[in-house]
């Protein structure tokens, strides 16, 4: 039996994710949840939902999260970490509020949260914290005992996140035709967000103008590119590019878009491309449609050989990283001195989101941070 690891004061881990439809009848109601409050007509949502209908109305994110749950539980058991793992979503079943209600009924009083977003941004961090605050307020209104909730730090530069992606890029390069492989370009991709949101991501005192979102992605891209060079002896050119833009066209978002980037690379005579979706934990719809369908169609139109590397998903190294992050945060809460594990130039992220981190346009209460009403 492995020596028991101590997660106290925590008594549960919550995997918190975006959610997605599980069949055609779920697509429009799911999109109504995603766009709630924006007044988007149902007919327009049916048009937007075509991405999901192409895949039978099923988002891959749910099975990806189920696989991650299994990987986490397996890793915890193998390493003597007695910590139950639950799952809740922002936009679809199992809904976050229902899961927290279940956890409260099970007697869970100190909960750690793993969000399926590795980087600092409003949509990837603070919005989840707002969701947590809203769910806890519901429990409070129902007269239930409200658990204390903390969130694991950003893990974008943890070895257990970076190394599987590096391996995926190397594998994709090896899959390219041998005659074009040496000149291949690596396009590191992530979700585009409004430039205003990017500029205010993370604590301003840490990241200044430009925010944490882009800087964190660039740090990961450099780590992977450097590791690829060490392994192959080839200094492949690379760039951070964006995908999955939405919203009003007059609002500036991060650019260039991956399809525009492929067009530019083709015009410059680049012989092949590896698309590396470093901004995503798993192969969900933005990866399967925007890269595997749309971007690959663009590359085929251009006659440009392209491969898409794998996301981390349920890789055992990522599950191990989560275990390490849990033990690390538990030690911090117990007053122990810890040395957080992190690669790259930026170092480990903060354990507790400070006041004013990743602000929203309309401020809302947010749990699991220095400004939490549920400390």
UniProtKB/Swiss-Prot annotation:
Protein family: Belongs to the ferrochelatase family.
Alphabetical GO biological process terms: heme biosynthetic process
One Gene Ontology MF term: ferrochelatase activity
Subcellular location: Cytoplasm
Keywords: Cytoplasm, Heme biosynthesis, Iron, Lyase, Metal-binding, Porphyrin biosynthesis
EC number(s) recorded for this UniProt protein: 4.99.1.9
Gene that this sequence comes from: cpfC
Pfam family, one: Ferrochelatase
Residues the record lists as binding Fe(2+): 191, 286
Protein name according to UniProt: Coproporphyrin III ferrochelatase
Main location: cytoplasm
Natural source organism: Streptomyces avermitilis (strain ATCC 31267 / DSM 46492 / JCM 5070 / NBRC 14893 / NCIMB 12804 / NRRL 8165 / MA-4680)
Reaction catalysis annotation: Fe-coproporphyrin III + 2 H(+) = coproporphyrin III + Fe(2+)
InterPro entries per the UniProt record, alphabetical: Ferrochelatase, Ferrochelatase_C, Ferrochelatase_N
């Amino acid at each position: 039996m492995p020596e028991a690891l101590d997660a106290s004061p925590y008594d549960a881990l919550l995997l918190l994710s975006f959610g997605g439809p599980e069949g055609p009848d779920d697509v429009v109601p799911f999109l109504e949840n995603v766009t709630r409050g924006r007044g988007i007509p149902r007919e327009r949502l049916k048009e937007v939902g075509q991405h999901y209908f192409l895949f039978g109305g099923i988002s891959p994110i749910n099975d990806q999260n189920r696989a991650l749950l299994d990987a986490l539980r397996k890793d915890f058991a193998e390493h003597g970490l007695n910590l139950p793992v639950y799952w809740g979503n922002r936009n679809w079943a199992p809904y976050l509020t229902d899961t927290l209600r279940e956890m409260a009924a099970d007697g869970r009083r100190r909960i750690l949260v793993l969000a399926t977003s590795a980087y600092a941004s409003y949509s990837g961090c603070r919005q989840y914290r707002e969701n947590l605050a809203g769910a806890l307020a519901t429990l409070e209104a129902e007269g239930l005992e409200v658990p204390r909730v903390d969130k694991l730090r950003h893990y974008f530069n943890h070895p257990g996140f970076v190394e599987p992606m590096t391996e995926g890029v190397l594998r994709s390069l090896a899959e390219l035709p041998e005659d074009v492989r040496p000149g291949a370009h690596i396009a590191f991709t992530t979700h585009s967000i409004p430039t205003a949101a990017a500029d205010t991501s993370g604590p301003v005192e840490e990241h200044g103008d430009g925010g944490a979102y882009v800087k964190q992605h660039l740090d990961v891209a450099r780590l992977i590119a450097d590791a690829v060079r060490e392994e192959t002896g080839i200094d492949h050119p690379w760039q951070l590019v964006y995908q999955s833009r939405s919203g009003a066209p007059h609002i500036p978002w991060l650019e260039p878009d991956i399809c525009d980037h492929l067009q530019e690379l083709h015009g410059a005579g680049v012989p092949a491309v590896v698309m590396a979706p470093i901004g995503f934990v798993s192969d969900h719809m933005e990866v399967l449609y925007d890269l595997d369908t749309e971007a690959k169609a663009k590359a085929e139109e251009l006659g440009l050989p392209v491969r898409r590397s794998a996301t981390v998903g349920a890789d055992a190294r990522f599950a191990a990283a989560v275990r390490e992050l849990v033990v690390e945060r538990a030690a911090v809460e117990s007053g122990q001195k810890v040395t957080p594990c992190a690669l790259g130039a930026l170092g480990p992220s903060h354990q507790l989101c400070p006041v004013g981190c990743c602000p929203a346009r309309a401020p809302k209460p947010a749990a699991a941070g220095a400004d939490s009403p549920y400390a």
